[in-house]
Amino acid sequence: MAVYAVGDLQGCLEPLQCLLEHVRFDPVQDRLWLVGDLVNRGPQSLQTLRYLYSIRESLVCVLGNHDLHLLAVARKNELLKKGDTLREILEAPDRDELLRWVRQQKLMHYDAERNIAMVHAGIAPQWSVKKALKQAAEVEHALQDDQLYGAFLDGMYGNEPAKWNNDLQGVTRLRVITNYFTRMRFCTSDGKLDLKSKEGVGTAIPGYAPWFSHQNRKTRDVKIIFGHWAALEGRCDEPGVFALDSGCVWGGAMTLLNVDTLERHQCNCDAVGNAATGIIASAQPGNAHIQQIPAQEPKQ
């Protein structure tokens, strides 16, 4: 059995299928991990969600900010933003079935056997794996509980509080947990968030740094797979931390990582997130040489 992790899809189905065909993914035997942002901005959000639902027994997904935005928009259509490509999902006859499935997904996955965690954006540096799983479970419970669901989504948006405090309660508590897992890039060593800066690692404001670079980070003994940060272009120099968002929806590439061998594969994308007619690049871990392989035609 092979386990593959793939970066942000954002409704880009063609490059995902291209990569899965390239590695000969078998949904009966293999497993596919997804770092979240399954939908939005790309050209095939509905088709992507339907495809993932069809292979759901082979999937491990964590939710990203765009997935949570989909759930919020499904409650209140006026929340649609310029550039959203969610309308087709909202008008689909199977929308309720698809949205119920999205609600059941995690904010954090931890494979104890491999000692690997997967999140969309990151893990607060002051949290251990045990603490992070506990906080993620609070949001997961709110998503799955009909009595808490609406209040959570209504209060989810916002940048405050910027820092975790164990005494936080209610929606305010859930908001900061959500921001760590789905929106974080830069923070201070004690976890104060800067949610406005979105460029590369060298653009941090004084006192802030990429969440994974803090020396006191309590998850340094764990491998972490994450997405969200397209400006990193799928590169992270921090040992044991694997960035998989390589900007597919912006004309970059979609990245697939073999979780056990750490071999990477990339499918080039065009400006709207379709698989480009170019190549798939494959590279062994620690090997700067990239082999160029013609991309296969994605399945329809």
Swiss-Prot record:
<keyword id="KW-0378">Hydrolase</keyword>
<protein>
    <recommendedName>
        <fullName>Bis(5'-nucleosyl)-tetraphosphatase, symmetrical</fullName>
        <ecNumber>3.6.1.41</ecNumber>
    </recommendedName>
</protein>
<dbReference type="GO" id="GO:0008803">
    <property type="term" value="F:bis(5'-nucleosyl)-tetraphosphatase (symmetrical) activity"/>
</dbReference>
<dbReference type="InterPro" id="IPR029052">
    <property type="entry name" value="Metallo-depent_PP-like"/>
</dbReference>
<comment type="function">
    <text>Hydrolyzes diadenosine 5',5'''-P1,P4-tetraphosphate to yield ADP.</text>
</comment>
<dbReference type="Pfam" id="PF00149">
    <property type="entry name" value="Metallophos"/>
</dbReference>
<dbReference type="InterPro" id="IPR004843">
    <property type="entry name" value="Calcineurin-like_PHP_ApaH"/>
</dbReference>
<comment type="similarity">
    <text>Belongs to the Ap4A hydrolase family.</text>
</comment>
<dbReference type="InterPro" id="IPR004617">
    <property type="entry name" value="ApaH"/>
</dbReference>
